[in-house]
């Protein structure tokens, strides 16, 4: 498979096969294509002459040609972000009630409705409505895809797998840039309707594919369906349900969930203002998502073609295509080092690199003024390209990785919903405000300022802030399980000490000793417990295996009553097949064979 060819190898001490989980995670990651493609198409469409001719409401640009008012272009771009913010907030109740997989299918259905409205739009109002509806679907996808990936992925490749969501976003941006180049010279409505309509193709493929994928084991444990969780995990790891490694992983997931439930019911108030470590995690996730936007990347992604055109750069469509190629290719190095370097180091290096590039662009533009525009454009293109490299290799994918890992199971969907919504709310502000930062007020008859390349002073300053924030607040979550991340937040007081964290107890041990009041792990008591001899550990595994077998047999016996009338000659084998089919059906009528 391609992912192994790129250099990732399963550790020798990991039982079974990770191939099914990797293939599932890679397919689900392509949900990012919807976001990337939609973002990329609007970047080029706003600069298309045919689009401006069809949708202009009387505005004349500096060249005396029909154009779009800044407030109108701001609405067209920003209302997608408004919709995504709404969708992100809806993702938690939907994902917890209907499951991650079914909610993703529903989200794609919403996106399809929005895309159809955009294709059929004949005025700005209908176009804005379509982008808002499509945004709701994308917002749900942006929460549930990383959540789905993190909950089903093996820990040794979890970060890399979640990074592929960002890779899919960049591939969508690149595809949109290619399509825009192929259609922008058309003089009919096909110039912009073809790029918009093409996104329906992959949306339908993704929705159909999701119907045959498994629900995540952690969600099934949260729902109380241990038998379905065992079967789902066995198919994702290619292990028998009684294999010690699978039993251990499933038991730890279940014990962790029982520990969280022992703390009492959760609410949005508890997530924000409850336990200190939970509030810290929420604050970390929200700030990371907001800082990702404040790096200024969507200034380039939304308005790059228009910005390069206003700066006097020749052939801005080709320059935007080059930037998207760099964006896509530069995401791949991040996949390689997200596990070996770790999340903290990669985020800090990326922020430092972006800050240097942006401040150099702004400083050179300020020093040169209106002189030597050719040299300014060369500096602009060069350092924007390097800046995109640093973003794509670090803050692009890694923010999604961290925010999908740091929350406990019982509030994971709610917390990711809040943090992702914070990303989209700020995305809306940037998308809406940018036209006013790049338009001459005399030409537009609106209150605006023409910062030009000096806007990079703003983005560069926030990148410097990002370096300090990562050092102080972001814990290192690589190479440990989602359940061990909970232990780390309980025990490690400062983020800069997190790289030295070593798990010392499990939630199974805590359950055996009894959860203490307030949910604080009985660390001292655990440390005082003598290590279990190998014979006792084996006996413990055998007991867990036996209990799983009993549970599954009971489940099978309840669902196989209708098969008892089969003949003695073939009844045994047929009943076994029937039982397995019905147990698979308990996962939601999905095919788990790989």
From Swiss-Prot:
Record topology, Extracellular segments: 35-73, 125, 181-193, 315-318, 367-378, 437-454
Topological category with respect to the lipid bilayer: Multi-pass membrane protein
Pfam families: Sugar_tr (PF00083)
This protein's record includes keyword Protein biosynthesis: no
Keywords, comma-separated and alphabetical: Glycoprotein, Membrane, Sugar transport, Transmembrane, Transmembrane helix, Transport
Gene Ontology molecular function: any one: carbohydrate:proton symporter activity
Region (Disordered): 512-594
GO cellular component, one term: membrane
CDD domains named among the record's database cross-references: MFS_HXT
Cytoplasmic side: 1-13, 95-103, 147-159, 215-293, 340-345, 404-415, 476-594
SUPFAM superfamilies: MFS general substrate transporter
Top-level lineage group: Eukaryota
GO biological-process terms attached to the record: carbohydrate transport
Record field: compositional bias (Low complexity): 524-576
Subcellular location: Membrane
Glycosylated residues in this chain: 372
Transmembrane segments annotated in the record for this chain: 14-34, 74-94, 104-124, 126-146, 160-180, 194-214, 294-314, 319-339, 346-366, 379-403, 416-436, 455-475
Function comment: Probable glucose transporter. Involved in sugar transport, carbon catabolite repression, and initiation of conidiophore development.
Stated family: Belongs to the major facilitator superfamily. Sugar transporter (TC 2.A.1.1) family.
Protein's name in the database: Probable glucose transporter rco-3
Species per Swiss-Prot/TrEMBL record: Neurospora crassa (strain ATCC 24698 / 74-OR23-1A / CBS 708.71 / DSM 1257 / FGSC 987)
Gene: rco-3
